A protein has these predicted regions:
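N-terminal Rossmann-like NAD(P) cofactor-binding module of classical short-chain dehydrogenase/reductase
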Residues: 22-25, 67
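Conserved Rossmann-fold cofactor-binding substructure of NAD(P)-dependent oxidoreductases
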Residues: 1-23
Length: 196
């Protein structure tokens, strides 16, 4: 294992990371809707150009498979339940747009260059060491912090909204399965990673 600390906007760094391997797990992104609204330019540079850099570096290095993080945000404001992979919605943020574009690039690179890709649409991931005080904290660590402090958790709205939460261990398992699946029909698509 070699840790490479670099910026995915740097194509040479991406080439170094892809050299000599046959599988890429691409999890790097600016992963926040509020941050994407505040800074759509940097979000686009990192999440789209950085994604393409990693994908292109993989193609050039002969990587056989590219497993990447997508997002439930590709469903936009769709109220349709359950969320079905083939029916995405209208993106509601710059972050969501970047994830939609990434899925298009993955399909395009498979068609043009033959690299297999699997997108994983994460739904509200939570787990150990998630910072409840961070600027972009998810609701689960906020609820846990409130309960541990003997306070009632804050619920915005009237409580009628629902969310699907996914434990981080399930996300890891989904990545490992996507990286090792042998059925060719399971490749070159995106999957919902959610508890349901």
């Amino acid at each position: 294992f070699e840790l490479i600390e670099a910026d995915i906007r740097d194509l040479d760094a991406c080439r170094k990371a892809a050299s000599g391997i046959d599988l890429i797990y691409h999890e790097a992104a600016l992963g926040s809707v509020p941050r994407s609204i505040a800074d759509p330019v940097t979000t686009t540079e990192v999440n789209i150009a950085g994604f393409v850099n990693m994908l292109w570096a993989g193609v050039q290095a002969g990587v056989r498979r590219f497993v990447y993080a997508s997002s439930s945000s590709v469903y936009g404001g769709s109220r349709e339940l359950p969320k079905v992979e083939a029916k995405t919605g209208e993106p509601l943020s710059p972050y969501a747009i970047t994830k939609c574009v990434n899925e298009l690039y993955a399909g395009n690179f498979h068609a043009l260059y033959g690299i297999d890709a699997v997108g994983l649409r994460y739904f509200n991931v939570f787990g150990p060491r998630q910072n409840p005080n961070g600027a972009y904290a998810a609701v689960i660590p906020n609820f846990m912090a409130a309960l541990l402090a003997h306070r009632s958790p804050v619920i915005n709205g009237d409580g009628s909204n629902s969310r699907d939460f996914t434990y981080v261990a399930n996300v890891i398992e989904a990545n490992l399965l996507a990286g090792t699946v042998e059925n060719p029909e399971a490749l070159n698509t995106a999957y919902n990673i959610a508890a349901g």
